[in-house]
Amino acid sequence: MIWYPYQQMKTMKEPYHIVDAQGVYLYTRKDKLIDSVSSWWSVIHGYKHPELNRAIQEQTERFAHVMLGGLTHEPVEKLSQKLEEWLPGDLDYCFFSDSGSVAVEVALKMALQYHLNRGSRRSKVLSLTHAYHGDTFKTMEVGDDPDYHGILREKRDVVHIPTQVEELERVFAEQGETFSCFIVEPLLQGAGGMRMYDVSFLRRARQLCDQYGVLLIFDEVATGFGRTGHR
């Protein structure tokens, strides 16, 4: 038996049985479906892309995976260098993880450790209403989904605010020196209802985070790879 994600086994609908995929399409034995969510945002370039398939095949003929615990290799070094060239400012270090939830967990841990290393015990996290950042425990806590995660709502070290500059300024004025980080899905909240907000909010968030020594985390699992515009 398979326990499918986000499903109650007694009430779930029969899943589509996929036998092939090409581009944006998924195929059952009799139907052709459009994958409008890119397999939860991960199949960015479509299925069976010839250049990607060729690169994967060439790499697996050498090795499919080598951990980075005390080891390194050319593909990860090349990717790190390319990301450093593309990313703005002084974003010069890359930490690799295996899922969106884990990437967010690592970012939150780094923020807490950063303040500990500076002699501060800041532990609060600022987040947005309607936020979604994953389904591990801490990412569920910083998300804003009472239907799924109500058991965690009694936690007091996460503050949620709407995407309004006035509320942003108010919460920083009142609690800014207690926040370790502010985590956002930039410009578009995906799983929270495809909610878009103005870039002026992000610009003000950057200013206030710098003013109060708060780290700003962009969760771009759903918005990266140019989905919100040109870099």
Regions found by a protein language model. Name each.
Residues M1-V24, R62:
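Active-site-adjacent loop/helix segments that line or gate small-molecule/cofactor pockets in enzymes
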Residues P5, K32-R118:
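Glycine-rich loop-to-alpha-helix module at the N-terminal edge of alpha/beta enzyme cores
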Residues T178-G193:
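Short acidic, glycine-rich surface-loop motifs adjacent to enzyme active sites
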Residues Q81-S180:
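PLP-dependent aspartate aminotransferase-fold enzymes
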Residues A107, I183, I217-F218:
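Generic enzyme active-site microenvironment
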Residues Y27-R29:
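Short, acidic, Ser/Thr-enriched surface-loop or helix-capping motifs
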Residues R195-T228:
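Catalytic PLP-binding core of fold-type I/II PLP enzymes
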Residues S42-H45, Q189-R195, T223-F225:
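Short, small-residue-enriched loops and turns at beta-alpha junctions
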